[in-house]
């Protein structure tokens, strides 16, 4: 349109000039020059129009990229209702009274973050990076010496009472979760890098890797994970505050390098997850009982083969609109089977021939919500489980010099009852035990600590001050039973333990 107007105006001016000029002065050469000038102007107009079109195209691309970036950041439109004063959000999000938003994928952030668009930043490659973690201050008092000052598995076999106190920050966790916002051929990729500050005592804040893995998940329900994370059979967790987390008292667990394949079937109100994988080496995987510098699980050509089958379903008796009620129940089975290798014990130490030892376990676990309560627990049985915090930390017992060792068999489990009173107060109580077979432990020359039984009872109270700051208080009663051995009297040793914790979650 602009070209037509300019051409018309110019032509009108030319015609007017021609009409005003004397007729005898207009020659064929003049007409030819005018035509050439018009053609030149038309070409210039076409070039200008092409340039304008290119600029408009680039502008559209910039607008599209900006829109895509805004979608990746997952901004949430928030408005306050004039009538009810409630916060309105996009579909599939929930907002607590504190202003924290819970998305459909379970992520959480604040309205201020959504407005400023500063949460979950995207890297240049399109990777979404989410820092997380918590800082925790812990104060502990115990009536007897325990095996560790800031967390505890066992009561030490000492006569008399010696009170102990300690302060620490070692249970603090720092981590980064990363994922690709968009699927590639139906696959999405997530990962995690997480560490804590667990060290030898309350002043030793050594970095300790907890999780370090990548998980590729397909829209069909298949996923492949490689890296270090929980063993495949881990399904439920006690509510205990102590950083020992009921290890060697009914709650086996470990995080170790692995390759796992998972298939999940999702239905309208339930799901079924099948896990299978191999676990090799890593922290605590059999340890190094012969002290040859190689972990016993790594010394064997066999890896641990692990698996689990977990079914969970909506609990129809629960009120889904009550934010204080857990709405799903869970039932699962799992286990492991594999070998480790170590030298036999002789009169001069672990320098005898090498042997392979079986490590195996079967487990059943469940979690059931009942109104504001949640009842959960597990039971397991197996042998040579010291590497996964069971069998009271005992793996293989050597009863004769130069003879083959015996795998320590054990059974155990825990039960935990949690209660959520309101958004501020919650409580829990639980008990667990680990009970090795006495004959596998008694009379041992090496390889075990002579622990015949270990249990723990605890009561917890939590007070949520803000959405990311809470306090916790725990009383625990610990009891460890020892076999009689050279330089140590057998018997039961108990202790009372009180822990105060302050958590800052981010």
Language-model regions, residue ranges each:
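Outer membrane beta-barrel
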Residues: 116-151, 155-284, 299-314, 323, ...
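Outer-membrane beta-barrel translocator domains and adjoining extracellular loop/strand segments
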Residues: 145-150, 198, 202-209, 236-244, ...
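Transmembrane beta-strand segments that form the barrel wall of outer-membrane beta-barrel proteins
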Residues: 188-199, 226, 276-280, 332-339, ...
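Outer-membrane beta-barrel "beta-signal"
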Residues: 307, 463-465, 492-506
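Detector for outer-membrane/organellar transmembrane beta-barrel domains
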Residues: 307-312, 318-451, 455
């Amino acid at each position: 349109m602009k070209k037509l107007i300019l051409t018309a105006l110019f032509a009108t001016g030319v015609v007017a000039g021609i009409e005003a000029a004397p007729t005898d002065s207009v020659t064929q050469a003049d007409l030819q020059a005018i035509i050439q000038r018009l053609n030149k102007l038309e070409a210039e107009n076409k070039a200008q129009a092409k340039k304008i079109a290119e600029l408009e195209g680039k502008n559209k691309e910039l607008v599209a990229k900006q829109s895509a970036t805004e979608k990746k950041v997952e901004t949430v439109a928030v408005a306050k209702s004039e009538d009810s004063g409630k916060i309105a959000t996009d579909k599939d999000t929930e907002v607590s009274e504190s202003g924290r938003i819970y998305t459909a994928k379970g992520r959480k952030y604040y309205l201020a973050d959504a407005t400023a668009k500063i949460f979950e930043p995207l890297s240049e490659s399109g990777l979404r990076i989410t820092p997380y973690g918590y800082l925790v201050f812990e104060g502990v008092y115990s009536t007897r010496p325990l095996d560790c000052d800031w967390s505890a598995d066992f009561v030490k076999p000492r006569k008399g009472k010696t009170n102990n106190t300690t302060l620490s920050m070692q249970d603090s966790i720092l981590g980064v979760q990363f994922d690709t916002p968009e699927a590639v051929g139906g696959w999405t990729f997530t990962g995690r890098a997480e560490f804590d500050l667990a060290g030898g005592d309350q002043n030793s804040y050594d970095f300790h890797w907890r999780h370090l893995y990548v998980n590729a998940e397909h829209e069909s329900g298949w996923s492949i994970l490689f890296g270090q994370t929980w063993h495949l059979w881990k399904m439920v967790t006690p509510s205990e505050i102590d950083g020992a987390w009921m290890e060697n008292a009914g709650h086996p667990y470990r995080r170790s390098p692995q390759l796992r394949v998972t298939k999940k079937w999702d239905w309208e109100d339930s799901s079924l997850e099948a896990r299978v994988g191999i676990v090799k080496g890593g922290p605590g995987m059999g340890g190094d009982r012969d002290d040859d510098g190689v972990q016993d699980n790594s010394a064997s050509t066999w890896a641990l083969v692990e698996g689990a089958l977990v079914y969970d379903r909506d609990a129809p008796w629960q009120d889904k609109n009550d934010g204080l009620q857990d709405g799903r129940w869970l039932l699962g089975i799992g286990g492991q089977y594999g070998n480790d290798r170590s030298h036999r014990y002789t009169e001069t130490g672990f320098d005898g021939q090498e042997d392979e030892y079986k490590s195996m376990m079967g487990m059943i676990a469940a979690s059931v919500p009942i109104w504001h309560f949640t009842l959960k627990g597990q039971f397991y049985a197996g042998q040579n489980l010291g590497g996964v915090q069971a069998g009271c930390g005992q793996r293989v017992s050597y009863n004769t010099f130069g003879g083959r060792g015996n795998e320590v068999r054990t059974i155990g489990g825990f039960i935990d009852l949690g209660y959520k009173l309101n958004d501020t107060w919650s409580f829990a109580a639980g008990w667990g035990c680990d009970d090795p077979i006495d004959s596998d432990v008694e009379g041992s020359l090496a390889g075990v600590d002579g622990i015949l039984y270990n249990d723990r009872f605890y009561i917890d109270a939590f007070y949520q001050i803000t959405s990311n700051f809470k306090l916790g208080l725990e009383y625990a009663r610990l009891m460890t039973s020892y076999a009689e051995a050279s330089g140590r009297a057998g018997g039961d040793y108990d202790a009372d333990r009180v822990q105060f914790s302050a958590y800052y979650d981010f």
